[in-house]
Curated annotation (Swiss-Prot):
InterPro entries per the UniProt record, alphabetical: Ribosomal_bL9 (IPR000244), Ribosomal_bL9/RNase_H1_N (IPR009027), Ribosomal_bL9_bac/chp (IPR020594), Ribosomal_bL9_C (IPR020069), Ribosomal_bL9_C_sf (IPR036791), Ribosomal_bL9_N (IPR020070), Ribosomal_bL9_N_sf (IPR036935)
GO function term, MF aspect, one: rRNA binding
Species this protein is from: Desulforamulus reducens (strain ATCC BAA-1160 / DSM 100696 / MI-1) (Desulfotomaculum reducens)
Protein name stated in the entry: Large ribosomal subunit protein bL9
Keyword rRNA-binding among UniProt keywords: yes
Annotated GO CC locations: ribonucleoprotein complex; ribosome
Keywords: Ribonucleoprotein, Ribosomal protein, RNA-binding, rRNA-binding
Length: 149
């Protein structure tokens, strides 16, 4: 018996997959728990249209992310901070500070989780930072850390 999975089922398949199962397994386990539905013609058509819309949406998101990455790539964000005697910062510059600087100086709102810092910036200078905007798109920006003086 063929069924369409409505949710991910361990050792059976992922949501939207069409799988063959025994009638008893489908009737007694999958249907009562709303894990699957019978693979009827209407259900298969509905599934096909859902997959097409998801593919189109994914393609659109990838295109938007690549366009944003192209715009952001190579930008410079200048941050002015308080500095101690030895040229070390009071505190550190985190990915949130970089995201705020990118928004205030260039108008691009990037989630701080997408900014990749190996460790917080604690010294003056220019740093090359990677932004992972999307799994298929990333951009590099320069962060200039200068003294407030």
């Amino acid at each position: 018996m063929q069924v369409v999975l409505l949710q991910d089922v361990v050792k059976l398949g992922k949501k939207g997959d069409i799988v063959n199962v025994s009638e008893g397994y489908a009737r007694n386990f999958l249907y009562p728990k709303n894990l699957a539905a019978p693979a009827t013609e209407s259900k298969l058509k509905e599934l096909k249209t859902q997959k097409q819309t998801q593919a189109a949406k994914k393609q659109k998101e990838e295109a938007e992310a690549k366009a944003l990455a192209a715009k952001i790539n190579g930008l410079t964000v200048a941050l002015k901070v308080k500095v101690g005697d030895a040229g070390r910062l009071f505190g550190a510059i985190s990915n949130k500070d970089i995201a705020d600087g990118l928004k205030s100086q260039h108008g691009y709102s990037i989630d701080k989780k997408k900014i990749v810092l190996k460790e917080p910036i604690k010294n003056l200078g220019t740093y090359k930072i990677t932004l992972k905007i999307h799994p298929v798109a990333q951009a590099d920006i320069n962060v200039e850390v200068a003294s407030m003086d």
